[in-house]
């Protein structure tokens, strides 16, 4: 059996496309959801009701607290309180227990850092099923899949630490160089980042209705958990204020003309990698690179992430920049800024990987495997041997051996385990 856990609608196209691949291989599939919007989307897509399973929030007071959830991404980003993180954790454990899982089953999950992911990993200790986590690769048409987790918690990160030389034997300098030149050119021609979108009035109405139903039916959607946790308020005036603040990022502040600058792209404030894999939040990282750029005799150009929804944070960044000489904020094409810079500084953003591809000196202050991809041999292996050729947003793929490649990742995990024993 192959299970696809959809914690929200984010991986909907990706996982439904993968499910079709497994169906073509005569595999049984089940979708596991925890929100009504995803549930109805699956039905409208023709998925049979028997193939859709719903996680319910249990009031399991007999179970112990999970102290490590205090530092979980869902708690840190205020998707839920610690109390409800514990409830979701044990509800997921109870749900997994009801499935009668076998070692031959495969569970496609989140990025490995969510509350549900931790529960799935914990339950896996006793029931040796396979897991597959996924994350954006920031390369069009490719997705990062990993049987252990994402970024610093991934098998790929472990491969770098183990430095298993035979994995890098396929390195082809010319092929990598040609790919990178083509990649940069394509990005320069059309560099589009999905923008943060505000809900329409109809979407807001549907959102409120579904959230109320989820609360009544004990379906633990992120929206309902935020309400239960007291982390959201119904405030129409705030929506109007938010709209005005967000628009302010559309123009450069304090125009810069020099090419003698360091580029610093900000990550979204609730980015999992910033919250759990860095000692610097966005504001601290900005101050770090202001100091560093000055020590290098460079100006600093900052770009707020296009998907940033925190208006208060945006205004805070602008206040800091307005008070600093030689520091600018820009909304120009990211690749234009990378290519025009002397160097690039990031926390642990994927933009750091893009800067490496562009041949720029790149600095990382957060923990990430992207910093290791300065080595072209590892970069080649990552692009050609590790990433899966399926688009994260659309689920579109141009090859038919997706399942075979995913199976190879599982075999690679076993190889690393054996390598560690030797």
What role is predicted for each listed range?
Residues 33-36, 57-58, 135-136, 259-271, ...:
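Short loop/turn segments at strand-loop or loop-helix junctions that form parts
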Residues 255-287, 298, 302-308, 407-411:
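Active-site donor-nucleotide binding/catalytic segment of nucleotide-sugar enzymes
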Residues 287-328:
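Catalytic donor nucleotide-activated moiety binding site of glycosyltransferases and closely related
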Residues 158-272:
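A nucleotide-sugar donor-handling region in carbohydrate enzymes
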Residues 155-207, 373-422:
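Leloir-type glycosyltransferase catalytic cores
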Residues 9, 109-112, 116, 331-376:
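A donor-sugar binding/catalytic signature common to diverse glycosyltransferases
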Residues 1-51:
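N-terminal subdomain of nucleotide-sugar transferases
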Residues 5-18, 39, 60-167, 174, ...:
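Active-site and donor-binding regions of nucleotide-sugar-utilizing enzymes
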């Amino acid at each position: 059996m192959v299970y696809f856990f959809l914690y929200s609608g984010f991986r909907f196209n990706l996982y439904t496309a993968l499910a079709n691949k497994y169906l073509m291989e005569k595999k049984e599939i089940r979708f596991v959801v925890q929100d009504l919007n995803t549930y109805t989307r699956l039905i409208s897509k023709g998925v049979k009701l028997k193939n859709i399973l719903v996680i319910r929030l249990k009031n399991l007071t007999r179970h112990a607290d999970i102290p490590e959830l205090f530092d979980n991404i869902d708690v840190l980003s205020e998707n839920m309180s610690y109390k409800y993180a514990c409830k979701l954790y044990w509800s997921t454990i109870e749900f997994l227990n009801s499935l009668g899982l076998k070692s031959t089953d495969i569970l496609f999950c989140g990025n490995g850092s969510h509350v549900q992911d931790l529960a799935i990993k914990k339950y896996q200790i006793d029931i040796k099923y396979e897991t597959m986590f996924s994350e954006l690769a920031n390369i069009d048409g490719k997705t990062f899949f990993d049987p252990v987790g994402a970024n610093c918690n991934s098998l790929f990160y472990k491969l770098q630490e183990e430095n298993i030389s035979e994995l890098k034997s396929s390195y082809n300098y010319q092929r990598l160089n040609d790919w990178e030149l083509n990649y940069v050119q394509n990005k320069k021609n059309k560099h589009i980042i999905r923008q943060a979108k505000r809900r329409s009035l109809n979407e807001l109405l549907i959102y409120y209705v579904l959230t109320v139903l989820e609360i009544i039916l004990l379906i633990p959607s992120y929206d309902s958990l935020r309400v239960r946790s007291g982390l959201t308020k119904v405030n129409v005036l705030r929506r109007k204020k938010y709209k005005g603040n967000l628009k302010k990022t559309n123009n450069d502040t304090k125009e810069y003309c020099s090419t003698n600058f360091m580029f610093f792209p900000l990550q979204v404030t609730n980015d999992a990698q910033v919250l759990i894999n860095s000692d610097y939040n966005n504001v601290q990282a900005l101050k770090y690179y202001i100091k560093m750029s000055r020590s290098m005799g460079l100006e600093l150009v900052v770009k707020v992430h296009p998907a940033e929804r925190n208006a208060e944070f945006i205004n805070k960044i602008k206040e800091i920049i307005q008070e600093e000489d030689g520091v600018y904020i820009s909304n120009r094409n990211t690749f234009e800024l990378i290519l025009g810079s002397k160097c690039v500084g990031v926390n642990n953003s994927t933009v750091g990987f893009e800067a490496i591809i562009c041949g720029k000196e790149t600095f990382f202050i957060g923990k990430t495997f992207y910093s290791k991809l300065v080595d072209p041999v590892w970069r080649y292996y990552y692009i050609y041997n590790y990433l899966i050729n399926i688009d994260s947003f659309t689920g579109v793929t141009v090859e038919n051996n997706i399942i075979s490649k995913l199976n190879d990742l599982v075999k690679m995990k076993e190889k690393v385990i054996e390598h560690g024993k030797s």
